[in-house]
Amino acid sequence: MIQMQSTLDAADNSGARKVMCIKVLGGSHRRYAHIGDVIKVTVKEAIPRGKVKKGDVLKAVVVRTRKGVRRPDGSIIRFDRNACVLLNDTTEQPVGTRIFGPVTRELRNAKFMKIVSLAPEVL
């Protein structure tokens, strides 16, 4: 569960290392974001010469959460860190060209096939 002020790892090569959620998109008083939800983030820590710099405000899709996601068969997929992939604000396509770490199948349903195809492992 991601809410405002939550810090996440950037799971792509956009140049960001740490980002902070500043808004959960999709509803006027929506409190939590789960895997596959789009959030608004600000870059808190970035590498030099990256595509994004510290202070940039972008959209991001949540790809891993410590809370996890429950499957219809009753199993729960959990991760040890919260992570997201940064998106272009207008096209909602990934800023980076590589995805690091596994992502879940739930992204396939949420119109993020580009992220699923770039990911090294889909759980």
UniProtKB/Swiss-Prot annotation:
Protein family according to the UniProt entry = Belongs to the universal ribosomal protein uL14 family.
Q: Provide a Gene Ontology MF annotation, just one.
A: structural constituent of ribosome
- Protein name per UniProt: Large ribosomal subunit protein uL14
Keywords attached to this Swiss-Prot or TrEMBL record, sorted alphabetically, are: Ribonucleoprotein, Ribosomal protein, RNA-binding, rRNA-binding
Among Gene3D superfamilies, the record links this protein to: Ribosomal protein L14 (2.40.150.20)
Biological function? Binds to 23S rRNA. Forms part of two intersubunit bridges in the 70S ribosome.
Give the multimer and partner information: Part of the 50S ribosomal subunit. Forms a cluster with proteins L3 and L19. In the 70S ribosome, L14 and L19 interact and together make contacts with the 16S rRNA in bridges B5 and B8.
Note the Pfam families from the entry.
Ribosomal_L14
